């Protein structure tokens, strides 16, 4: 069934609808028709729905963030949906609501999972929109106002507001730019399948889009995908930070999964995708997201090696037939080189080879060293790096390039094409595997070395990068006046190198011998504020930038550059 038919797929059955209606009246004490809620007629633009169960101290941060919202309290409501916490949580929530007329507490029977409380929040919502927030997270000060304005402007059914990870890394592609009308399969919507989004309340109700209730893994994926398929307009608001997603120790996502119960829930999500797409490129592209993120990463590298033997066998007993049944060659084709190998080994049930591959990956070591450094008179810093990727002290990634017959490839009319294969993988044999499985040309074309400055805040600032021809001599150039603007108060930090080689990625500190950097000296006038490269006691390279001193030198450097540019134009 095509995407355009998505709305018809998301209706709950009558028994479920009746059950939810009964629970809603009990929880809210209201008998008004649901159609009177969520229309915005009350002046409430958005209902913030928070599933609550015995919250910790960070709950105060959430409430404080709601108190700071730029949207007037009369324009939004907060629904604290208590999942049977008991005392003292009940008293704590009552105290929050006592001094805030726009806060309501829904006291619910315990379900043990956030789906049921969220559903009650949607049922009770009076706002035009619903924004889901978890009890350990918080909103940025302008979030509700900006999200509602953006949804109004684009007539959005769903708005994905920019999420910021607190103590956790988050995908970045989805938030590179605002996307008023995002499309599944074209825009990176699958990068962020959390429920921390703004939804049009009437849209959820009309399409019967609800969270599964009870202990259901990936319930957020199920809910969001149903919404994505049913939505007329999905918008991404990337220009404004909206949601702080806080990593708390012991969260459900931190625990090791139980294969026998987890993967049936994954298949339910896959069922939704297949129900709303025809076989072909779009379906393959969507399915690839879960194949890569929920299966292949669990059988890779150190993670796979560290599993107890019995757990590893249980995991493979479940995922091997799932892969054979649900993910075809079209899904594999868009995977990176390491994942294509893992997928082929899984599909062939080559368990010993999977473990050998994981051990090989776990033993990979990357090191990046400065072999030469100089300043140019124009203010540029030129570094030559050597990058080594080894395993047990030897080159880990060994390639062989051979000529192939043009009739067997998509080669040009010249009659021959060169093909590069990785020959150093510890596979027992390649018999029974796809013939071009070890061909790595596509990934080698995308090899990259990038240098970053790691700030005191932990943020990484991109300094330089390139696609190297030879990892033994990687030339990069850093222009301090382009990296730092005139008012930038950065004092520098450690230099980090991120390497992509044949589909594997590494992140390592940049090293150098002190003597190599000692010959470099201080930066010239046209580099702006004085910058110095030093090697710390452990040999790690730091860029140290003068601040707040050096203002006159910075201004002079910028002025001279502007003058030179004007002369060249003239």
PLM segments and residue spans:
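Generic detector of well-ordered alpha-helical segments enriched in charged/polar residues
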Residues: 94, 267-274, 284-288, 316, ...
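Generic preference for hydrophobic/aromatic residues in regular secondary structure cores
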Residues: 101-103, 140, 163, 206, ...
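A broadly tuned preference for mixed-charge, low-complexity surface segments
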Residues: 208-220, 289-291, 346-357
């Amino acid at each position: 069934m095509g995407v355009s038919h998505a709305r018809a797929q998301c209706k709950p059955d009558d028994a479920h609808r009746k059950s939810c209606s009964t629970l809603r009246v009990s929880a809210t004490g209201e008998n008004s028709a649901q159609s009177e809620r969520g229309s915005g007629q009350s002046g409430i633009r958005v209902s913030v729905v928070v599933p609550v169960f015995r919250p910790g101290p960070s709950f105060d941060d959430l409430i404080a963030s709601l108190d700071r919202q730029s949207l007037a309290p009369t324009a939004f409501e907060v629904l604290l949906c208590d999942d049977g916490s008991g005392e003292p949580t009940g008293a704590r929530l009552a105290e929050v609501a006592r001094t805030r007329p726009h806060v309501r507490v829904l006291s619910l029977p315990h379900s043990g999972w956030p789906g049921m409380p969220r559903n009650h929040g949607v049922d009770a919502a009076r706002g035009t929109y619903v924004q889901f927030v978890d009890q350990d997270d918080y909103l940025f000060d302008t979030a509700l106002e900006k999200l509602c304005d953006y949804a109004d402007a684009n007539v959005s059914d769903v708005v994905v507001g920019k999420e910021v990870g607190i103590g956790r890394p988050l995908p970045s592609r989805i938030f590179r730019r605002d996307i008023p009308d995002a499309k599944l399969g074209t825009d990176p919507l699958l990068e962020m399948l959390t429920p921390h989004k703004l939804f049009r309340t009437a849209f959820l109700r009309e399409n019967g889009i609800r969270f599964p209730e009870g202990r259901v893994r990936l319930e957020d994926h199920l809910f969001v995908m149903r919404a994505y398929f049913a939505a007329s307009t999905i918008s991404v608001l990337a220009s404004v930070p909206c949601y702080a997603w806080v990593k708390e120790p012991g969260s459900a996502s931190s625990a090791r999964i139980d294969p026998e119960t987890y993967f049936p829930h994954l298949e339910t999500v896959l069922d939704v995708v297949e129900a709303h797409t025809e076989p072909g490129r779009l379906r393959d592209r969507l399915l690839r997201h879960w194949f890569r993120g929920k299966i292949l990463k669990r059988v890779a590298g150190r993670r796979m090696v560290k599993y107890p033997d019995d757990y590893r066998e249980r995991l493979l007993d479940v995922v091997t037939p799932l892969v054979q049944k649900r993910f075809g060659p079209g899904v594999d084709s868009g995977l990176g080189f390491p994942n294509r190998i893992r997928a082929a080994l899984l599909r062939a049930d080559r368990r010993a080879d999977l473990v050998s591959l994981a051990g090989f990956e776990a033993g990979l070591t990357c090191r990046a060293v400065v072999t030469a450094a100089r300043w140019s008179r124009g203010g540029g810093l030129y570094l030559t790096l050597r990058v080594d990727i080894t395993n047990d002290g030897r080159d880990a990634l060994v390639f062989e390039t051979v000529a192939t017959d043009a009739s067997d490839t998509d080669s040009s009319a010249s009659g021959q094409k060169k093909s590069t294969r990785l020959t150093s993988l510890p596979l027992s044999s390649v018999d029974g595997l796809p013939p071009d499985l070890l061909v790595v040309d596509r990934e080698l074309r995308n090899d990259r070395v990038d240098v970053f400055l790691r700030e005191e805040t932990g943020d990484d600032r991109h300094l330089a990068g390139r696609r190297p021809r030879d990892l033994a001599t990687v030339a990069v150039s850093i222009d301090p006046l382009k990296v730092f603007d005139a008012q930038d108060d950065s004092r520098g930090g450690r230099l980090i190198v991120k390497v992509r080689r044949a589909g594997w990625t590494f992140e390592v500190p940049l090293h150098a011998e002190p003597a190599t950097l000692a010959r470099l000296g201080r930066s010239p006038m046209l580099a702006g504020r004085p910058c110095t490269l030093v090697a710390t006691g452990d040999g790690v390279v730091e860029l140290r930038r003068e601040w707040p001193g050096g203002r006159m030198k910075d201004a002079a450097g910028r002025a001279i550059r502007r003058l030179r540019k004007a002369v060249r134009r003239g």
